[in-house]
From Swiss-Prot:
Coiled coil: none
Classification via InterPro entries: NA-bd_OB-fold, Ribosomal_uS12, Ribosomal_uS12_arc, Ribosomal_uS12_euk/arc
Molecular function per GO: rRNA binding; structural constituent of ribosome
Name of this protein: Small ribosomal subunit protein uS12
Species: Ignicoccus hospitalis (strain KIN4/I / DSM 18386 / JCM 14125)
Designated gene of the protein: rps12
UniProt key word Glycoprotein: no
Biological role stated in the UniProt entry: With S4 and S5 plays an important role in translational accuracy. Located at the interface of the 30S and 50S subunits.
């Protein structure tokens, strides 16, 4: 006769609890968290923000059904030298940023840390330019410092 499915009895709670814990490994998010998979593949290495140097300005074509050129920049991260593409939000945002500027990037906020909306392959966005908020520069509240 094969083994019973679950222990039953007055003192079986600990055994039941331990058995349940093993099933967590079949859940995708649990497995990713325990094996630290995000930190291993993520260019930001699990951090919420990262500093980088602008290498070039690029235009990324929007996905169907939209027709636009989304303004982005190629950024080389200071901490590990990896190169990523970051979206530049705001009207005229790309005019403010020039090559060799120091920018701070954050995740763009797509599902499961992926790209957002119609911008293919872009997972990050620019928030600071030379230590000043890009939003403040675009609104005219602050001037971009010259490095």
């Amino acid at each position: 006769m094969p083994g019973k499915k679950a222990p039953n009895g007055l003192f079986a709670a600990r055994k039941l609890e331990r058995k349940r814990l093993k099933f967590r490994w079949s859940q995708r998010e649990f497995k990713r968290r325990m094996l630290k998979l995000k930190e291993k593949y993520d260019p930001l290495e699990g951090a919420p923000m990262a500093r980088g140097i602008v290498l070039e300005k690029v235009g990324v074509e929007a996905r169907k059904p939209n027709s636009a050129v989304r303004k982005c920049v190629r950024v080389q991260l200071v901490k590990n030298g990896k190169v990523v593409t970051a979206f530049v939000p705001g009207d005229g945002g790309l005019n403010v940023i020039s090559e060799h500027d120091e920018v701070v990037i954050v995740g763009i906020g797509g599902p499961r840390g992926r790209s957002m909306g119609d911008i293919p392959g872009v997972r990050y966005k620019v928030v600071l330019v030379n230590g000043v908020s890009l939003d403040a520069i675009l609104k005219g509240k602050k001037q971009k410092p010259v490095r």
